[in-house]
Amino acid sequence: MERADNSNLEMLLETDWQLHQVYTGENIFFVIAKLGWLKTLHTLNVLIDEEIKPWLQQRNKLGDTCIHVAALANRGKQAIQLIEKLVEYGANLNTRRNCNGDTVLDIAVKNKDHELTVWLWKQPSINLQTEKFFHYVMDQMKLKESQENKMEILEAYMMQLFK
């Protein structure tokens, strides 16, 4: 289920980002990703430059980047749209979490977010060099009643294996 995008630009402008980053290790992209504020993320487009892009690779106190937070806090279409925009701005789909080495794809698999998992499999830059994905595919194949859904899962998986 998608959350409403209740973007609050005023709150973001009033935040002391230096202090916030000292306590949490999080910059504005983490907050936007956590709250699912896609509209606000789109408005930042004009501000993204070479000086801002490194913020997309910063890690919070838990060792996550904003792209991990987007996958952890959101599901389905909302997660896809946030991650897509963060990648467009310069985030890396294959960055691993410091706490357990998971990528965004690992998070999607663990959260059983089928929509996000299939979308990630279709991304040309995604790294599938882990057996978690094979087990996920097999589990999904067992669960799916519809032949069409089975084919979608297999097709996405096979596309990535042979790209």
From Swiss-Prot:
SMART domains: ANK (SM00248)
Keywords from the UniProt entry: ANK repeat, Host-virus interaction, Inhibition of host NF-kappa-B by virus, Repeat
ANK repeats: 62-95, 100-130
GO MF term list: NF-kappaB binding
Family: Belongs to the polydnaviridae I-Kappa-B like protein family.
InterPro entries referenced in this protein's UniProt entry, alphabetically: Ankyrin_rpt, Ankyrin_rpt-contain_sf, NF-kappa-B_inhibitor
Name of the protein described by the UniProt record: I-Kappa-B like protein N3
Species assigned in the record: Microplitis demolitor bracovirus (isolate Webb)
Keyword Repeat found: yes
Gene Ontology terms describing biological process: cellular response to tumor necrosis factor; symbiont-mediated suppression of host NF-kappaB cascade
Short name of one Pfam family: Ank_2
Gene: N6
Record function comment: Suppresses the host immune response through NF-kappa-B inactivation. Possesses ankyrin repeat domains required for NF-kappa-B binding but lacks the regulatory regions required for dissociation from NF-kappa-B and degradation. Therefore, prevents host NF-kappa-B release and subsequent activation.
